[in-house]
Design a protein with these regions (language model features):
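Short C-terminal beta-strands that terminate individual repeats in beta-propeller domains
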Residues: 58-60, 105
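Hydrophobic beta-strand positions in blades of beta-propellers and related beta-sheet-rich domains
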Residues: 45-47, 92-94, 176-178
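Short loop/turn segments that connect beta-strands within beta-propeller blades
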Residues: 49-54, 96-100, 180-185
């Protein structure tokens, strides 16, 4: 026996909130194995029967890690976000829980997160942080490339910026997209042209929302 150390606490595996299958028999949970070097940190999805009749088994394993699992209404597919095969930002993938490789659904330059299945299982609702003034995917892609090509990464603020917990937010705003889970489908920005309600922020500036946006399908 020994005293708990800083390393024990920091390097302990961390679990995300479980995603229950529609029949309640299975739970998928994200398991993050921390590391002092962020590049060595691993986050994968595991599945376990809710009655405890069998040990958990790993569903995914990739260097980029996976997160935000969501079951399809019929319980045969799992949507999640990940960076795979050269993805520069997280995209939505769909995995058949009966076997096979995960398939990429989204290819947005601004990435995708928080996927939600439509009641019929044919489409996914998700969030992407778009650039101000960009009305199309091509414009968002150009803005993302321009930012990537910069030879500097300093940020200059002339007033106190919006802060979300432990990181500074940039000028992008969350928008809501829908896309069919089918080959060659395209994402549609449901909030395009919508003016977000502004609220007072730090230093008297105005902010429109945060990095979080919540949405749900009607039955």
């Amino acid at each position: 026996r020994r005293a708990i150390t800083h390393e024990d606490v920091w390097l302990a595996a961390r679990l995300s909130a479980p995603a229950l299958s529609p029949d309640g028999k299975w739970a998928v949970v994200g398991v993050t194995e921390p590391a002092y070097d962020d590049k060595q940190q691993v986050s994968d999805l595991w599945i376990v029967p809710t009655d405890g009749s069998a040990p958990a088994r790993r569903l995914t394993s990739s260097p980029g890690g996976e997160a935000s699992p969501a079951w399809s209404p019929d319980g045969t597919r799992l949507a999640f976000t990940a960076r795979r095969d050269g993805d520069e930002v997280s995209q939505v993938y769909v995995l058949d829980t009966r076997g096979g490789e995960a398939q990429r659904v989204t290819t947005l330059a601004t990435g995708a997160r928080s996927p939600r299945w439509s009641p019929d299982g044919n489409s996914l609702l998700f969030v992407s942080d778009v650039y101000p003034g960009a009305k199309t995917e091509a414009e968002n892609k150009a803005a993302a490339q321009e930012r990537k090509n910069r030879k500097w990464n300093a940020r200059v603020f002339d007033s106190f910026p919006i802060r979300d917990w432990d990181r500074w937010l940039d000028d992008r705003q969350p928008s809501l997209f829908v896309q069919a889970v089918a080959p060659d489908s395209a994402a549609k920005d449901l909030l395009a042209g919508t003016t977000l309600a502004a609220h007072p922020g730090f230093g008297g500036s105005l902010g429109a929302g945060s990095e979080n946006i919540t949405a749900a399908w009607t039955p």
